[in-house]
């Protein structure tokens, strides 16, 4: 008992955190002080303590730091301790080491003051443990390096890396350097070599290429461009072309320009000294509405519009340089309602009008409205030269025609519903909108006026408000907004950085991850422009940044989690092995998510729209490049951080500093932050491991019905009513800003409300039918470059000069005029069918003049080929000389080449269809006309058999391409997602459920967008097609986790997948949701739409995957091999590393996988069939929890599916490879079973001098060995239990409530404690945690170091013992010889209801998938039974029961029988 005075009991907290406290005095520890110490323990490592360091390859090295403060008294204490324990404390004695998790550092000290840690030697057992989730634990504290330590290991010789993992582990700086060089080179080449993108025309690339209509439109446009003087085609013969070009080159103006000049000459207001011109489409304009929704026809509103004109437009400094003027002194007045009232009432300005003038003008408008609406009042009714009414409008009152003011008010300034014929004279007029025309040309010159006086200023004065603006700068302003609004993606990136930093607890890893994401865009731009040679870079490519931020963060979270799983599974492994295992699993998981999303983007390549195809290639490439960086750059960053940078930002302080009261503000702040983060992580753990599985499973029927109803509702909204609408705005009015922007409101709302806009945009014009022969409708340009439209391809078989062709064309024109879809004009159109005009001209020519012959009436139709070729040239030239009509590039008729040969002809008729944006009407028009023409061409002669027609079908083709391309892209995305899911899980049922979940997600998402008013335009098409790639990720993660779950039943698999993947999936969804939310304030429509879409798809896909998919798996999920694709036997259990393969030969037959038949969860709501056993006593619950809390394991080996072959006493079990028993929930060692723990223990004893022995706080654990006592403590988390070959019982009197999610204090224990010679030669593999020994032994060793006799393990308070049954067991049971060591799997150890510890037999079962176990019914040897258990407990290492704190939820026994809800 010499040491008992200096030592207190060695303790292991019930939550899995071991501690041993050895105060120098018997002064009790204050509970409150101890509680405070437990919170900050993790941040208080002793700087004198010899710590473990990570070597070059991740190996652990013992590092001893010298301390200048070491005193002689401390050395004396150490020497005295060595004298007291000459055999029990060899040089390899283990002392406390800093922990990864929130352990109590002060509890870890073996000798707080009496025996300083500087005098102790750190053994190899002091290896830092690894937690389970980054969300629930702290990243820097998970790493193998210890705080404030320096690596002093000797330099190792150069070793060339054998594989990629060793390259990452040994040469992370080299890998990072190579990646950095490549990124910099790609950036420089991508920026310097090709031209920078030009976003001045955002509509560029929005036209379809490659469609039948698209090829015709491209060919027609090329034909128009190549028609003219010295061009490929000409309207005139070449001999006359030069003369005609010279005489008409000054007249080749556009029709609008000509008409405008003509109107300017006709309507010259300069004599009236008021208006300079008439309002028109070329002038800047503003739309006003009442601020309170009232009538604008009142004097306050009219004067308010005049004030806006003076203060916002005319007062700008640049206005004087831009306005039109009659004199140098002043600018022309604006065309406003007030100025027109002033003209009609002879007032000088708008400010001079009165209420009487307004009423008088209204009366004039009332009396003249009917003349305007019936078409009799037109712009030509006033002769400005004579200042009198024109004779054409003699029946109209003069007041209606004076100055054409009434016509211009109705046509330009008021909305079309004002004073319409439907309103009677007795109803008050209702003017909703009025327009103001400024005497400035719209365009770039108006940019400064808009930016200074309109963009950020209030648009209302309380009376009127500016609702729409048309300055002609929409696309120019878009380019500026596109760059300035990148601040919102930047804000999103910053917020994602904060979330990642909190999640990983490492600023270095966070910044390097974001650098990898940005680098992905740079490298993909290089590949896009230089390697793929794409010349066109649409503005939509910029939105790839937002999507990539979410995906990159998801990959970082996955790698973080997998890294910690690997370190937890193999804490003693070298760094290269950790990297290898991490990449094996993380690379696959990241590849699944990256490939499915990239495939969804690449699927857009099937679209016919150039911008969508380019965006799909760029975004898909960026995601794949990001994946490559995530498996090269990011692992190297993690290794570099772990080896060198983990200690830079630590907030830990040594115990000496803490005791001296030298804690700084930052240390206190860091502790507070750590406590808050720990509380958050605890809440997260409870939610994802307890609450969420409970909610999902208990309410599964409700969730299924609810989400099925949502799916049906979404499908109804998308497909039936109101369904996804095609775009309703022309391409020229394509929306680029948010809907509330005044530029967009003018195009979308107000343009159709004013008559001059309706007429100019062709809503009252007939659709033309243009038919072409002689040119092949082929788009020979680059479909990925909207600027490259190719060259004109002529039809070599074309021949119009043959008599048969002449007759057929004439008959064709006559048939076409008789069709119902052709508009019959009253005026004779001599240009529609040139053959009719030519025949008539020939018949009217007199043959008396010899020079005319043969082009005269003597020649009969059809004409000879030579006559036709000669006379058609004369007819065209005569037509040009005798009429003022000029033939332009779009005029129907023949087209000549440079040799005067007719190479093409054009016919054009007007149809009865009016231009409309409605898809159905345009579709009917195209199908009807094209079908009739193709039917007629079947009987055409050989020279005219390849004709085709075209019309104003650009918008219809865009609509058609969007509707078809979106569906095809989504279908391809679904096929790829299903394929990837199938290859990942090898299970058809899981893959089918995932696709059903994705379908529901798509329907609900698109339905929500429809209800939000979305139309299927270009941007919407891209976002919707990408929905499949973004929504499949969550279902894939859950599906893979379901298949890898070791539990045999559905409920266990669902709980496993939810608890393991729930946190990472939620974080991925959160980061992407935040990135989308930050885009909402943007002005650019592409950003706001993408933000809306990301928020919706993340919420809906997470909900469907978590509740709908998991409930389907719980209800009808596959069990065993149901739905599994059969694989070759060699592949079923061959998933192993090279190191594992080398160990299999020594362990026995490879290929046998282990599982168990029953499992229990310690979560009451998850009980499928709860057995009502009445009220269990506290002792029962404590005993069951003690059994679970005292199980520990070695994680030094990744034991595979193999039955271990030893010379004697071999146990073999063969079951299916897909199920595993007693597996740690977060370990990657999916083939490891609890029965392997004994063999692991034997190998560990042979390999190390310090053996793990997990202990809880209430236990006193010592296992009697021949020469050594294994007392080194395991650092596993209490909620992540592990295996052991030792049975330990803990007395209920010492149980304390554990703090959840704590791990054992790493390294706190004793190393190779030599025992006196009273020991027996036998070894016991089953021992009680509170041992009892002979009195002599008790006197020679401390109370807590009592060693059990091989035959008994008793509690100090009882005489009950746990013995091995020496008798012959029943059939199928195993006889144990206690005098010889046996290899006893832990999962075969059971307790009877009377407390006896028995060993169950584990029979070899070949055809079945479970292990049969029987409870030994022999009576206990002990005369006094220790009633520790009253029911059998078969606890699996990976069950939920092991992951809970003992006091959180009471233990409930759950019937583990297979669910009756079976699919197979």
Swiss-Prot record:
Example of a GO cellular component annotation carried by this entry: membrane
Which InterPro entries does this one have?
Dispatched_Hh_regulator (IPR052081), HMGCR/SNAP/NPC1-like_SSD (IPR053958), MMPL_dom (IPR004869), SSD (IPR000731)
Location, primary (coarse class) = membrane
Q: Where is the composition biased (Polar residues)?
A: 9-28, 38-65
User: By what name is this protein known?
Assistant: Protein dispatched homolog 1
Query: Which family is it part of?
Result: Belongs to the dispatched family.
- Tell me where the transmembrane regions lie: 173-193, 482-502, 507-527, 531-551, 586-606, 620-640, 701-721, 970-990, 992-1012, 1022-1042, 1065-1085, 1089-1109
Source organism per entry reads Danio rerio
Topology of the protein relative to the lipid bilayer:
Multi-pass membrane protein
According to its UniProt entry, the protein's GO biological process terms are: adenohypophysis development; animal organ morphogenesis; anterior/posterior pattern specification; blood circulation; embryonic cranial skeleton morphogenesis; inner ear development; muscle cell fate specification; retinal ganglion cell axon guidance
Compartments where found: Membrane
Q: Which UniProt keywords apply?
A: Developmental protein, Glycoprotein, Membrane, Transmembrane, Transmembrane helix
Q: Which residues are glycosylated?
A: 346, 374, 458, 564, 608, 818, 899, 1140, 1190, 1394
Q: Which domain of life is it from?
A: Eukaryota
Subunit composition and interactions:
Interacts with SHH; via the cholesterol anchor of the dually lipid-modified SHH (ShhNp).
Pfam hit, one: MMPL
- Using the record's annotation, list all stretches that form the SSD domain: 468-640
Gene3D superfamilies from the entry? Multidrug efflux transporter AcrB transmembrane domain
Residues covered by region (Disordered)? 1-73
Quote the function comment for this protein: Functions in hedgehog (Hh) signaling. Regulates the release and extracellular accumulation of cholesterol-modified hedgehog proteins and is hence required for effective production of the Hh signal. Synergizes with SCUBE2 to cause an increase in SHH secretion.
